[in-house]
Amino acid sequence: MRREMPAENRIWGIVCFISKKPLKLDTLVTLSHEACAMFCRNTAHYAAALGLILSTCLLHAAQSYEVSLEHASTRMRDGVTLRADIYRPKADGQFPVLLQRTPYNKSGGVTFALKAAASGYVVIVQDVRGRYTSEGDFYTFAHESDDGYDTVEWAAALPYSNGKVGMWGGSYVGATQMLTAIAHPPHLAGICPVVTASNYHENWTYQGGAFEQWFNQSWTSALAQDTFDRSVQKNTNALGGAWKLPLASYPLFNFSDPSAAPASTTTLAPYFLDWLAHPTYDQYWKQISIEEHFGDINVPVLTVAAWYDIFQGGSLRNYIGIKAHGGSEAARKGQHLFVTIGGHAGGGRKIGEVDFGPAAAEYDENDVTLKWYDYLFKGVQNEFAGKPVKIFVMGANQWREEDDWPLARARSTKYFLHSSKNAASLRGDGSLSTAAPRTETTDHYVYDPANPVPTIGGPLCCDGQHMPPGPRDQRPVEARDDVLIYSTPAFAQDTEVTGPVSLELFAKSSAVDTDFTAKLVDVGPDGFAQNLTEGILRARYRDSVEKASLMNPGQVYKFTIDLWSTSNVFLKGHMLRLEISSSNFPRFDRNLNTGEDPALARNFVSATNTVYHDADHPSALILPVVQSH
């Protein structure tokens, strides 16, 4: 049977076909009126169609410019010259500026630059110091505040600039924005950092005191390709076998003597050696930590995070910290948060091994960025005029707007650990419930650094070919005897968990130091175990990442493990599961259990780790449970 197209759709097609070129408002109204007169059968159709046409076609009929490209250079305060590409409208007048400072080659910003310039922005993409066409030496984070300040003020003074400068981009490009913002250049008017960190020790290089080995090795190797004119491709390819390294061969990084380090590291990535030399949160890190400088940020910020991103925890802390401690009312009240499904390299409908439905594919980073600056710089009343927080809720697989983050209505709920025999592997009897434990046995396992628990998915970067990120079936890990498993019964109704997740763990070890890992998992009726979020804590940093404190073997300690955040509806019939172990390799380096620096140690010992869950040691997973509307 032939289906008739709705009147609104036919009208939209006619008007937008006629109005391929920019039209004035009165012309649009006339065309819309005429089309409605032809196709609308009643007043309701007329009103609906006219509203649809005007809202949609006004967007398409916004002034569009031809774009010119030119190359420019600017001198920093110390005399170093940085080079940039400038995309701008071929028109007289002055326009707001959107600036990106990147270590990944300025030619990579073309797609957004052309789109934004055609929409009435001057777009500047600059190679940061020591990268590609810019002069100087690249050293992570060190020059980004001063160079960012100088570049913003140079951009604001260009003859075609109206004096308003915004910044955009993700990962290290997000870091260049944050580090520029804490220097508060007068003409910086907004930033849009995407998937970036808040602390370059505890959310970039380390987590819970453990070294982010996979990210740091793969990212550093990728950066070195430009530094050495891409001749170190063989080093990048070698990463493919990193997880198969001889696990009993030590030391892993023999860099205590710089002459012992590989030449490719000392000459191409000297910062890597410094990261290893500063395992604690000391002044080396504090001077560049965004968390230490929230009060210096004076501009509105759109923070874009992703549930499976390697910097998710830091992105959310940026939003919370600037909203609470920003240096101006405009900053505190101008915070917006957008949390997508996906990982560090982007999103889409299918992430890892999970299909999140058509709504997941709606996110477009370039579109969101442009809307943010249309709202901020041009006063366009778009989605950013509404609630400040927008998140993707997994399980329900839909977007939702919120008043704030974390959600005020989320109820902190303790799910206590239980077992009657032993919770080791899927063959054990570990369980989770809201009932507090009384008298129960302990659970134990042996952690052998030569046989670590392998990383399967999760927040990974930057070599997806060899170590695919995102949600993946965790059953291979859960079959191991050195992984403790605690599960709820199948839920009788949909249960939402949205917000920060943590684990209060009472445990002891036979070693002076070890790691404890935790992973939150959604288990479907078919057994598929989808990882949601995870965390790690190196025992020596249980009190503070600023100072190491070894354990007394056999003594019970309380450990608090930060699993970052999630938003997931555990559907009816699904189970919620917690995995506990002592390694997640090669995402994190292995703790050798000796108390030595893992990067330099030559020996290792196995550790027998014991988890307590009784009345005196109520180990519990703390979840933000959200009641349905």
Residue spans for each PLM region:
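Accessory cap/linker subdomain of secreted extracellular hydrolases
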Residues: A118, I182-D296
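Short beta-strand/loop motif that positions the catalytic acidic residue
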Residues: T303-A305
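Glycine-rich nucleophile elbow surrounding the catalytic serine of serine-hydrolase chemistry
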Residues: G170-L179
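C-terminal, loop-rich substrate-recognition/catalytic regions characterized by aromatic stacking residues
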Residues: A242-S259, E353-H629
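N-terminal cap/lid segment of alpha/beta-hydrolase-fold proteins
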Residues: A62-K90
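Alpha/beta-hydrolase fold nucleophile elbow
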Residues: Y160-S171
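Active-site-adjacent alpha-helix of alpha/beta-hydrolase-fold enzymes
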Residues: G313-G334
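Cap/lid segment of the alpha/beta-hydrolase catalytic domain
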Residues: G93, V97-A156, R349-F356, F585
